[in-house]
C-alpha cells in the first residue's frame, strides 16, 4: 500500500479524488492502492527545556544558557493531534512506500519529516512537488515524483532554522525576563521579531526627536504655469528674500524646451509580500488577513502557491498562459465578467502573447513561481477574497500588455537682473508628462479614478516607501502649455515658507517592505545581498511576526500607523547586544541557512556558532549591574486613550504667498511666523549622558546626542 500524507485535510481529499482513493476511513481516504492521510500543519515540535532535564523546568538565571546535547521532537499536546498521529503511525508502519505531499517549501518539508521520524517510518519515500492545486497540476506532480533524498538539504535548512530559533528564543527570553521583566510578564526575544520591533522603535524615536525647521522655496508663475528655482530650497529667509528681490519686476525668459519620449513597463507579478503591501494600502487588510485570504484562494484552486518570494515565472508556464487567460476571462467577480473586455482587447493588440524576460526568467525562480491565477473561474468568493483575486488577475493580464508610452516635456527659464555692477541670474524649471499610449495602464483605468493609492505600479515596481523615504517616480499625466525658446514676459514670483516634516510612522504596508528590503540598514555588502533576497524573516512568516508583536503588547495600531508601546521601546533600549536587534542578525542567519540549503555550509557549524553566541550574550547580560527595568503594558493599559500629542507651538506656514504682495518690493515674501514660546526644558544639559542638551520632539523630550546612543527620553505625558 502507498501512503500519501498531506498538510491539510482539504488538500488530502483533493489528492485522494485524483488518484482514486475514494473510500472514507477514520483519519484517511483509501482506494486504488493508496491511503491518503493528513496532518493539521505542525503535529510535532522541538522538545521544551524541561523535557531534557527537570533543572530547566523552573526559570533561573543560574541555568542559562540551556543547550541540549541532542535536540529531540515531541507531539504537540492536543487530543485531536494525538488521535490523528496514531492513525498516521499505523498507516506508515504498514506502508510499502510513502509519498510526502506536504507544502512544497522549507516549512512544509520540516512538518512532514518530523511526523515521519516520530512514526518511525522505514519504507522508501517519494516527494510530490507542485505549485498549484488544480487537477492538472496534481496529476502532473504524481507523474514526476522525486526521491525525498533530493530535498535533504531543504530539510536540514529548516531544521537548523528551528533549532537556532530555539537556542536564541528560549535562552534570551528567559534571560531578559528574569533580569529586566519585574516578574510580571514574559519579555519575548526572537530572531525576527526583535529586529522588526527595533525598526518600529527606531522610526518612532526619529519622529519623537525630530525638530521641524523652516525653509523657503522660490517659484514664479509664468503663463499660468508654476516654475521652481533650480537652486533648490533656502535655509535662510534672508537668502530667499535676496533672490526674490533679484527677480521682482524683471522679465521671465524661456531658455530651453525639450521633449523626451519614454516607456513604463508593466508592474511585476505578485509575490506574497507585494500582495500583502497592496492589500494593506488598498483595502486596509492586515498582512495576516491577506495571507489567510490568498491561502484560501490557493486551496480552492483559483490561484497558485502563495508563500513565494519571487515575481517571475518559469519558461514552462508560457505555453499555458493562453489557457489561463481564457479561464480568467470567464470569471465573474461581484456578478460582472470584468476581465473579458481586457483579454479581448489584448487579443487585438497581438496574435501571440509576448514573452518578456521581465516576466519569464528561470534564473529568478527557485521553489515556486510568482502568484498567478490558475485559470479555474472562481465562484462563491467572499468580498474580501474577490478583492485579492482581482489584484492577482489584473496583474497577470497587465504583464502581457505593451509598455505605457509617454512624453516628458522640460521647460527651462531664467530671470536676469542687470541693475547692479554684475548681472544676477536666477534659473527656473518645470516638467510635465503626457501619456501617448496607455498600454498596460488600461487594465487599471477604472481603479485610477478611485484614489491615488490605487495606482497600479505603486509597490509593484519597488516604489513603496521602504523606510528611507525613497520612492521611485511613476508616470502621472501633467500637460504643459506650448512654450517657445526665447519667449519672455511678465511673471508673478513667490517666496513660500515651509517646514521640514518628520519621517512617517510605519504602516503594515511600509513595514513589510522594510522587512523585505532590510539590506539598506546594514553596511556589509555580502549581508546586504542576502537581505535583498530574504529580508527579515521569510515571506510566509512576516505576517505572523507582526501579529506576535501585537499580542506581546510591544506595538499598537493607531489608525493605520504602527506605534511602539512603552514596553516595546524600553525592551529595545534595554537590549545592548546589537546582534539581537539589528538587521545584521537576520542577514547572517539567512545567508548561512541558504548556504545549508545549497549544500555549501555545514549545519553543525551553524548550530555551534549559535551556541557560542548565546553563551556570550548570557555573560554580558548577567554582568550588567544597572537597575534597568522594562515597563510592562497590560491589556487595560492598551485600552486607555493615548495622551494627546504635544507639538511645538508654532503656526502652520502659509501654503502660498500672495501674488500681489509678491510683486511689492516692500512685501516680497510670506510674513514671518511668530517665534515659538521659549521652553524652559530645551537647551538644558542631558541628565543621562551629560554630553548633549535636551531637545523637544513631537511627543517627548530627548537628547541631541541620541544618534550617538544616548537613550534619554521623557514623554510629555509624564511631565
Regions found by a protein language model. Give the residues of each.
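C-terminal or mid-to-C-terminal helical accessory/interaction module adjacent to the motor/catalytic core
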Residues: 80, 93, 135-216, 220-222, ...
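Intrinsically disordered, low-complexity regulatory segments
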Residues: 1-162, 166, 170, 448
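Basic, low-complexity terminal or inter-domain segments flanking catalytic cores
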Residues: 2-3, 118, 287-288, 309-719
Amino acid at each position: 500500500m502507498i501512503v500519501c500524507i498531506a498538510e491539510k485535510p482539504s488538500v488530502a481529499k483533493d489528492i485522494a479524488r485524483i488518484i482514486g482513493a475514494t473510500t472514507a476511513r477514520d483519519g484517511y481516504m483509501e482506494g486504488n492502492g493508496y491511503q491518503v492521510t493528513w496532518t493539521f500543519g505542525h503535529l510535532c515540535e522541538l522538545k521544551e527545556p524541561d523535557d531534557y532535564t527537570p533543572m530547566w523546568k523552573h526559570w533561573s538565571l543560574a541555568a542559562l544558557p540551556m543547550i541540549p546535547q541532542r535536540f529531540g521532537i515531541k507531539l504537540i499536546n492536543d487530543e485531536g493531534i494525538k488521535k490523528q498521529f496514531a492513525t498516521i503511525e499505523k498507516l506508515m508502519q504498514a506502508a510499502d512506500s510513502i509519498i510526502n505531499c506536504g507544502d512544497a517549501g522549507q516549512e512544509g518539508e520540516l512538518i512532514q519529516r518530523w511526523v515521519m521520524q516520530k512514526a518511525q517510518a522505514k519504507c522508501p519515500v517519494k516527494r510530490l512537488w507542485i505549485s498549484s492545486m488544480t487537477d492538472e497540476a496534481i496529476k502532473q506532480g504524481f507523474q514526476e515524483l522525486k526521491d525525498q533524498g533530493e530535498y535533504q538539504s531543504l530539510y536540514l535548512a529548516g531544521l537548523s532554522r528551528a533549532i537556532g530559533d530555539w537556542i536564541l528564543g528560549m535562552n534570551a527570553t528567559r534571560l531578559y525576563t528574569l533580569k529586566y521583566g519585574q516578574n510580571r510578564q514574559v519579555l519575548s526575544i526572537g530572531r525576527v521579531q526583535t529586529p522588526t520591533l527595533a525598526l518600529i522603535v527606531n522610526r518612532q524615536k526619529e519622529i519623537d526627536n525630530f525638530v521641524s525647521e523652516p525653509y523657503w522655496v522660490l517659484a514664479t508663475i509664468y503663463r499660468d504655469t508654476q516654475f521652481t528655482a533650480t537652486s533648490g530650497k533656502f535655509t535662510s529667509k534672508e537668502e530667499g528674500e535676496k533672490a526674490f528681490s533679484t527677480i521682482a519686476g524683471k522679465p521671465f525668459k524661456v531658455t530651453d524646451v525639450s521633449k523626451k519620449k519614454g516607456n513604463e513597463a508593466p508592474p511585476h507579478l505578485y509575490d506574497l509580500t507585494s500582495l500583502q503591501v497592496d492589500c494593506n494600502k488598498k483595502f486596509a487588510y492586515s498582512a495576516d488577513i491577506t495571507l489567510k485570504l490568498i491561502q484560501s484562494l490557493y486551496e480552492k484552486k483559483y490561484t497558485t502557491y502563495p508563500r513565494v518570494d519571487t515575481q517571475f515565472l518559469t519558461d514552462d508556464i508560457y505555453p499555458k498562459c493562453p489557457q489561463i487567460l481564457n479561464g480568467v476571462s470567464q470569471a465573474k467577480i461581484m456578478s460582472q465578467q470584468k476581465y473579458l473586455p481586457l483579454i479581448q482587447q489584448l487579443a487585438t493588440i497581438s496574435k501571440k502573447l509576448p514573452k518578456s524576460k521581465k516576466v519569464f526568467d528561470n534564473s529568478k525562480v527557485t521553489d515556486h513561481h510568482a502568484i498567478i491565477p490558475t485559470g479555474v473561474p472562481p465562484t462563491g468568493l467572499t468580498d474580501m477574497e474577490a478583492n485579492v483575486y482581482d489584484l492577482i488577475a489584473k496583474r497577470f493580464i497587465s504583464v502581457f500588455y505593451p509598455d505605457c508610452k509617454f512624453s516628458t516635456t522640460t521647460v527651462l527659464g531664467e530671470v536676469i537682473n542687470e541693475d547692479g555692477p554684475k548681472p544676477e541670474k536666477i534659473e527656473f524649471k518645470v516638467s510635465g508628462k503626457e501619456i501617448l499610449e496607455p498600454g498596460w495602464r488600461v487594465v487599471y483605468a477604472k481603479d485610477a479614478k478611485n484614489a491615488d493609492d490605487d495606482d497600479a505600479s505603486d509597490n509593484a515596481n519597488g516604489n513603496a516607501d521602504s523606510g528611507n523615504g525613497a520612492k521611485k517616480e511613476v508616470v502621472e499625466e501633467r500637460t504643459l502649455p506650448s512654450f517657445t525658446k526665447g519667449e519672455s514676459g511678465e511673471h508673478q514670483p513667490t517666496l513660500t515658507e515651509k517646514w521640514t516634516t518628520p519621517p512617517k510612522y510605519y504602516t503594515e504596508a511600509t513595514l513589510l517592505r522594510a522587512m523585505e528590503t532590510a539590506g539598506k540598514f546594514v553596511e556589509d555588502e555580502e549581508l546586504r545581498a542576502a537581505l535583498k533576497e530574504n529580508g527579515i524573516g521569510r515571506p510566509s512568516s512576516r505576517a505572523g511576526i507582526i501579529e506576535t508583536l501585537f499580542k506581546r503588547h510591544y506595538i499598537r495600531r493607531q489608525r493605520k500607523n504602527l506605534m511602539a508601546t512603552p514596553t516595546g521601546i524600553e525592551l529595545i533600549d534595554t537590549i545592548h547586544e546589537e546582534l539581537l536587534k539589528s538587521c545584521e542578525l537576520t542577514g547572517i542567519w539567512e545567508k548561512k541557512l541558504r548556504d545549508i540549503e545549497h549544500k555549501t555550509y555545514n549545519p553543525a557549524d551553524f548550530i555551534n556558532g549559535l551556541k557560542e553566541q548565546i553563551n556570550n550574550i548570557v555573560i554580558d547580560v548577567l554582568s550588567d549591574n544597572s537597575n534597568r527595568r522594562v515597563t510592562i503594558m497590560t491589556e487595560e493599559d492598551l485600552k486607555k486613550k493615548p495622551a494627546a500629542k504635544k507639538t511645538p507651538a508654532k503656526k502652520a506656514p502659509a501654503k502660498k504667498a500672495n501674488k500681489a504682495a509678491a510683486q511689492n518690493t516692500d512685501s516680497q515674501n510670506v510674513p514671518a511666523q511668530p517665534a515659538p514660546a521659549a521652553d524652559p526644558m530645551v537647551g538644558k544639559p542631558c541628565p543621562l549622558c551629560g554630553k548633549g542638551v535636551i531637545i523637544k520632539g513631537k511627543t517627548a523630550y530627548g537628547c541631541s546626542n541620541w544618534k550617538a546612543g544616548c537613550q534619554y527620553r521623557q514623554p510629555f505625558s509624564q511631565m
